[in-house]
Amino acid sequence: MLKFFAPASIGNLGVGFDVLGMAISPIDGTLLGDCLSIAPAEQFDLEIKGSFSDKLPKEPKKNIVFRCWKNFCQKIGKDVPVQMRLEKNMPVGSGLGSSACSVVAALVAMNEYCAHPLDQNALLSLMGEMEGLISGNVHYDNVAPCYLGGLQFILDTQSRISQSIPLFSDWLWVLAYPGIKISTAKARNVLPVHYSKRDCVDHGRYLAGFIHACYSQQPDLAAELMKDVIAEPYRLPMLPSFLTARQKAKEMGALATGISGSGPTLFSVCPNLKTATSISDWLQHHYLENDAGFVHICRLDSLGARSVG
């Protein structure tokens, strides 16, 4: 039996709506993401376990993992009977790429099991297609970093879907998931159809400046430019505690704070462990709403999806 892990990811990073995403891992070694095991079988079978398995459909054929298996088999032109076991350790609707974790784990497992019939670009394209079945449209800002690791800039051209961007190895990222669910589709529906010229210019300036700061290794400039004029203003009513948390994090030394993906998870970028620990402790007591919530101090995950046994 082969086992694979697909890590959590932060979509958008505030400044890059639908075009930036980064894989993330807790510094304490916790596997924040989904694990999937695969073994030979006479027919397809899926077992679902894990901390958040009760949030998924009871019928295996309604799970995205089954649809990944089915579409992968269609791509390679033959059915491959396997037994899969999904360990669902990511909360659904958390803003941490939960569906991407399942999609990436399933497709990486199938591609490895079948001796790599799909190349990286073809596999990533299929991942985006499968993610679109959950969120309502094809996008790669979670599946690309979850699969490839690091910070990914989504190009979505004919020759290349995403490009790795250098980040800052000393940055720590505090993630706080309050324990409530926000549907990605619902979070996208609150966004306007049209934006002002001012917002478009500002968005382009912030994103281009952030990419420049990453390549020129200017962390202070990069953090200053992590501003969201596209999604955050319209999603704030769904996150009533966010502004208070961001202000407190800033007072405690955070370089930047934003909404992870569609929310409700927030991230705070910290320059050192002392600051990260202080902010983590505050969020633990003031941002979490129930026992399902959690806070992790994380680093960039440069590995992406990988074999774990």
UniProtKB/Swiss-Prot annotation:
Keyword Ribonucleoprotein found: no
Which major enzyme category is it? transferase
Q: Quick check: keyword Isomerase in the entry?
A: no
Q: In which pathway does it act?
A: Amino-acid biosynthesis; L-threonine biosynthesis; L-threonine from L-aspartate: step 4/5
The reaction(s) annotated as catalysed by this protein in its Swiss-Prot or TrEMBL entry are: L-homoserine + ATP = O-phospho-L-homoserine + ADP + H(+)
Q: InterPro entries, per this entry? A: GHMP_kinase_C_dom (IPR013750), GHMP_kinase_C_sf (IPR036554), GHMP_kinase_N_dom (IPR006204), GHMP_knse_ATP-bd_CS (IPR006203), Homoserine_kinase (IPR000870), Ribosomal_Su5_D2-typ_SF (IPR020568), Ribsml_uS5_D2-typ_fold_subgr (IPR014721)
The UniProt GO MF terms for this protein read: ATP binding; homoserine kinase activity
Note one Pfam family from the annotation: GHMP_kinases_C
What is known about what this protein does? Catalyzes the ATP-dependent phosphorylation of L-homoserine to L-homoserine phosphate.
Query: What is the recorded name of this protein?
Result: Homoserine kinase
- Organism from which the protein derives: Hamiltonella defensa subsp. Acyrthosiphon pisum (strain 5AT)
- Recall the taxonomic lineage recorded for the source organism: Bacteria, Pseudomonadati, Pseudomonadota, Gammaproteobacteria, Enterobacterales
